[in-house]
Amino acid sequence: MKIRSTALVKGFRQSTPYVNAHRGKTMVILLGGEAIADKNFSNIINDIALMHSLGVKVVLVYGARPQINQLLDKQSSQTPYHKHIRVTDENSLSIVMQAAGQLQLAITASLSMSLNNTPMAGTHLNVVSGNFVIAQPLGIDEGVDYCHSGRIRRIDTEAINRSLDQGSIVLLGPIASSVTGECFNLLSEEVATQVAIKLKADKLIGFCSEQGVIDEEGNAVAELFPSDAEKFIQKLSVDVDPDSDFHSGTLRFLKGAVAACRAGVPRSHLISYKIDGALIQELFSFDGIGTQVVMASAEQVRQACIDDIGGILELIRPLEEQGILVRRSREQLEQEVERFTIIEKDGLIIGCAALYPYIDEHMAEMACVAIHPDYRDGNRGLLLLNYMKHRSKSIGIEQIFVLTTHSVHWFREQGFYEIGVDSLPMAKKSLYNYQRRSKILALPL
């Protein structure tokens, strides 16, 4: 009798919510030349194919920096850099095109494999490349002519979406044509970032040399807001060797992730190309493995003060009257106002949530979550949740829980799962209202 491991079954079951959540979503993946040259590249390709088979719409952007350098070295040639951007003259352009063309064919061939006894057995992927991106020259900066180094002029999002809807993987490289028929060398990080923004992608994913953004203790930072990511960028720009792969690839992608999030891409992920299965672990497991930069809002998110009491009452009173929220008096709000986080727009409070920590149990309750009816079509509930998670982690909280009668599905979509009354902190358990019969859901941090 064969001994069967339950680990596979358990992992497969736990991934189901993420499979459902990602199905039909558009994700832009950046594979730098360093990732393609790594021994783990074939596993990355297998994981991208798996994502596609699970219904994810994939745009794959590749770079060619080390491959270009290798070809230049063979010819005993070098290209100058200006502000960390390669100056691509007429002589080096042919080498850049050669490297990019070889990688395009190699990636397409890898995605086309469907041999038996391989992870891609039975897959039949269509890979589409073309002039989806139109370029223009960077021009002259501080007296330096970038020649055939360029930037994006426009992106044919309609054509890309049409290819994605037909089930194809769209493959984009660092070479793009201009309206004059010339070729230009683009930064792959810029291509990935701008494509994600223009497509209004759900995720931007970058394979980098590190596991993500690494803190001073050597651990990957799981989640960053754009403002926090910018602080890391400033620090790393000073501390890191400007000629290193981290500076040229990871740091540049992190800047792109910040730009993408601020332009409306909900999440950008940094994962290591050296770790087998990093892509699957990041997207289809609860804990993830890398760093994600999550969307911040142009609206102000801040801790509430006493002057906000009237606005909070105006926001939550209709929900209290409907029985969705537990009624709070003005006096109670005045006493607890420091526990509230609000979203403010043009002087109007359009969202709020409160955090009640139970330090001894390392738990915290997220309560009184409310969004103004005119602003419920965005991601403001998720924005408040992200702030609550960030705030909870800073004070050593390991689990957030909520009591809800009407929003069970929304919280479950965010990774919460149902727990019993006995799992509540002792002080909260004694206050549980059995007549209201609120569902209790928890989210480990």
From Swiss-Prot:
Q: Which GO terms describe its biological process?
A: L-arginine biosynthetic process
- Report the catalytic activity: L-glutamate + acetyl-CoA = N-acetyl-L-glutamate + CoA + H(+)
Under PANTHER family, the record lists: AMINO-ACID ACETYLTRANSFERASE, AMINO-ACID ACETYLTRANSFERASE NAGS1, CHLOROPLASTIC-RELATED
Domain N-acetyltransferase stretches: 299-438
Report keywords, A-Z. Answer: Acyltransferase, Amino-acid biosynthesis, Arginine biosynthesis, Cytoplasm, Transferase
Q: Where in the cell is it found?
A: Cytoplasm
Q: Which GO terms describe its cellular component?
A: cytoplasm
Q: Name one Pfam family in it.
A: Acetyltransf_1
Entry EC no(s): 2.3.1.1
- Family the UniProt entry places it in: Belongs to the acetyltransferase family. ArgA subfamily.
NCBIfam families under this entry? N-Ac-Glu-synth (TIGR01890), PRK05279.1 (NF003641)
| Superkingdom as given in the UniProt entry | Bacteria
Q: GO molecular function, one example?
A: L-glutamate N-acetyltransferase activity
Protein's name according to its UniProt entry: Amino-acid acetyltransferase
Q: What class of enzyme is it?
A: transferase
InterPro entries annotated for this entry? AceGlu_kinase-like_sf, Acyl_CoA_acyltransferase, Asp/Glu/Uridylate_kinase, GNAT_dom, NAGS_kin, NH2A_AcTrfase
Q: Part of which pathway?
A: Amino-acid biosynthesis; L-arginine biosynthesis; N(2)-acetyl-L-ornithine from L-glutamate: step 1/4
